[in-house]
């Protein structure tokens, strides 16, 4: 066989392997997808036993020049497919009673892929369709930061056309512990090794877990401000508990009694959006439950035709779960505040936003740790508008950090996807909110 024929054969084989990860049709969606979707695995570690699964969706605008985002869901252990379907992707799930076939999908109007390329990553290992070839060892915040950095380096080496695109690391909820540390890791990696460097520009976080012990204490003043507890509960709590409402000293019996009263008042409040009907998110199989779509996404992702369409490795995964709560995990980053500070010193842009009806990570807590950074505000607290209506409030700081609230928003973008999209669109374009 001539050298030329061998080369052509290798070229055809390479093209076949590459095109095998391109997804043009999805069960439940009528016709070909109106966007470019690639799925695949990247091995992590020396032996590549950890296999991170990703969805890559090209920008619908100008993929060659638009920003590249890497999106991480929270949990830890929640699949990025939830981000695609419920928060900021180009397809969503129709609210229909499950009939045994793959649930139906529809095109969204609020996808961030309208002006950005996005890598949606299933991490840590064990979440979504990511898996390990060997039994999963206990992982944690720090090890996942390093693994995700390795993933990004390898992904870019396979997609070198995106090296020059501005990179932003984005996520929400528990990824508030991972994203700032990952930004620092990428930044330091650019100095230590690797040519060309990753074109890191900044990061974006929604209702981020940042310092859990600190943040939980703000649930009580938030509940009081929203009228969930009375003066008779709040004023003594403030005085007797000294601002420490969690991990209460067992000898402080008065504080313990008051916290019991608080829990009685809020036990049936949906912590992710206080105006949303409460139902058990671990049992969402009833169509009457607000979170019934969480059941539908599990039905969809566990459909064999869906797995074939997404090119899921056969035998790599049992039942897909929206959030895998069984992953052995060390919460070894206590606070991500120092990472925010270091990233600001390095000159990276950041947008921190809060749905103002979230009590899990109240906007009061996020404002408090931002204040602790002691950065000068560029402008005073002001409303930001959509169609001449207030969509939230914002303040920008001298360290390139912007804080914004989303009026009526909850713990994730799914509660106000259109407003979150417009906020993202303005910020990523360098416009004031």
Curated annotation (Swiss-Prot):
The keyword Phosphoprotein does not apply. One of its GO terms (biological process) is proteolysis. Disulfide bonds join 78-323, 241-255, 279-289. Residues 1-19 form the signal peptide. It comes from the Eukaryota. Its EC number is 2.3.1.92, 2.3.1.103. Keywords: Acyltransferase, Disulfide bond, Glycoprotein, Signal, Transferase, Vacuole. Highly expressed in seedlings. Expressed in leaves, stems, flowers and siliques, and at low levels in roots. GO terms for cellular component: secretory vesicle; vacuole. Changing residue 272 to D: 78% reduction of activity. The active site is at residues 173, 358, 411. Glycans are attached at residues 99, 283, 324, 342, 418. In cv. Pna-10, this protein SCP8 and the adjacent SCP10 are not present due to a natural 13-kb deletion. Belongs to the peptidase S10 family. This is Serine carboxypeptidase-like 8. It comes from Arabidopsis thaliana. The lineage of its organism: Eukaryota, Viridiplantae, Streptophyta, Embryophyta, Tracheophyta.
């Amino acid at each position: 066989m001539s050298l030329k024929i061998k080369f052509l054969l290798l070229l055809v084989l390479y093209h076949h392997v590459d095109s095998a990860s391109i997804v043009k049709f999805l069960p439940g969606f009528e016709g070909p997808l109106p966007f470019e979707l690639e799925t695949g695995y990247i091995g992590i570690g020396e032996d590549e036993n950890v296999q991170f699964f990703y969805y890559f969706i090209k920008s619908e605008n100008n993929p060659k020049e638009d920003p590249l985002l890497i999106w991480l869901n929270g949990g830890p252990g929640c699949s990025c497919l939830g981000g695609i379907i419920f928060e900021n992707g180009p397809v969503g799930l129709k609210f229909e009673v499950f009939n045994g076939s793959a649930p139906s999908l529809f095109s969204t109007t609020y996808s961030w892929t309208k002006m950005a390329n996005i890598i949606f990553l299933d991490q840590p290992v064990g979440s979504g369709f990511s898996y390990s070839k060997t039994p999963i060892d206990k992982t944690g915040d720090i090890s996942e930061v390093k693994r995700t950095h390795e993933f990004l380096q390898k992904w870019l080496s396979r997609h070198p056309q995106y090296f020059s695109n501005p990179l932003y690391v984005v996520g929400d909820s528990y990824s508030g512990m991972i994203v700032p540390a990952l930004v620092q890791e990428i930044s330091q990696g650019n100095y230590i090794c690797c040519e060309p460097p990753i074109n890191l520009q900044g990061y974006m976080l929604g209702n981020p877990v940042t310092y859990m012990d600190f943040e939980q204490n703000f649930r009580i003043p938030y509940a009081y401000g929203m009228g969930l507890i009375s003066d008779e509960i709040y004023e003594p709590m403030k005085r007797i508990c000294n601002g420490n409402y969690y991990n209460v000293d067992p000898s402080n019996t008065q504080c313990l009694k008051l916290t019991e009263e608080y829990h009685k008042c809020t036990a049936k409040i949906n912590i992710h959006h206080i105006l949303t009907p409460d139902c058990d998110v671990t049992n969402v199989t009833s169509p009457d439950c607000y979170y019934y779509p969480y059941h539908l996404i599990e039905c969809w992702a566990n459909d064999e035709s869906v797995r074939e369409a997404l090119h899921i490795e056969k035998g790599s995964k049992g039942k897909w779960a929206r959030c895998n709560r069984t992953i052995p995990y060390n919460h070894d980053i206590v606070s991500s505040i120092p990472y925010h500070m270091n990233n600001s010193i390095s000159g990276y842009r950041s947008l921190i936003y809060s749905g103002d009806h979230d009590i899990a990570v109240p906007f009061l807590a996020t404002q408090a740790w931002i204040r602790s950074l002691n950065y000068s505000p560029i402008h005073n607290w002001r409303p930001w508008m959509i169609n001449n209506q207030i969509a939230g409030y914002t303040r920008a700081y001298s360290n390139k950090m912007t804080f914004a609230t989303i009026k009526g928003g909850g713990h994730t973008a799914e509660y106000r996807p259109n407003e979150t999209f417009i906020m993202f669109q303005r910020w990523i374009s360098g416009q004031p909110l």
